[in-house]
Amino acid sequence: MVKSKVSVIVPIYKVDGFIERCVVSLMEQTLDEVEYIFVDDASPDGSVNILREVVERYPSRKDCVKIITHSENKGLPAARNTGLAEATGEYIFHCDSDDFVELDMLESLYNKAKECDADVVWCDFFLSFETNERYMKQPSYSTPNDALKAMLSGAMKYNVWNKLVKRSLYIDNNISFPA
């Protein structure tokens, strides 16, 4: 089996109104060799059924999808950790299940990471609400120290869902989410 370029981790809990758009945007990515890990955090609604229905529409991606089920709700950090433990890709991308992404997002981030030999790359994003949407431009930095300072000072948003992170960074530094 070919090693995945990117493992996408998607926690699922009470998102039946959003999950279809999220999964479609992931299944239609232009990047090949993507592993999709969906973690059902004991969601009591129909989110996982919707997920399965959408995955069926994409037979070429179906074998790249893992659905892991928690027997009880453990919370978002635990769901992310479950996904990390299963991930095999060179890079990790976290996607919240109420998000949707541009169709070339993973390819753009992956190509930039490879071009720069980067451990972490990030992108701008939109915050979408029922009545409006805001474009959130993220600053660019040329050194790791500058990026870290910006993250710690709040100049750059610290969300995980707009960043592609080398999996070895998690493994080598024993990084997990506080659960």
What are the roles of these predicted feature ranges?
Residues V23-T69, K114:
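Acidic donor-binding segment of Leloir-type glycosyltransferases
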Residues M1-E28:
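N-proximal low-complexity "stem/linker" segments adjacent to membrane-targeting elements
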Residues T69-A87, S108:
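Glycine-rich, basic loop-to-helix element that forms the pyrophosphate-binding segment
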Residues D96-F100, D119:
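The conserved acidic donor/metal-binding loop of glycosyltransferases
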Residues D104-Y135:
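Conserved donor NDP-sugar-binding/catalytic core segment of glycosyltransferases
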Residues D124, M136-A155:
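Short, flexible, basic/aromatic active-site loop/helix in glycosyltransferases
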Residues I92:
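Short aromatic/hydrophobic "clamp" motif used to bind/position activated sugar donors
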Residues K149-A179:
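Conserved nucleotide-sugar donor-binding catalytic segment
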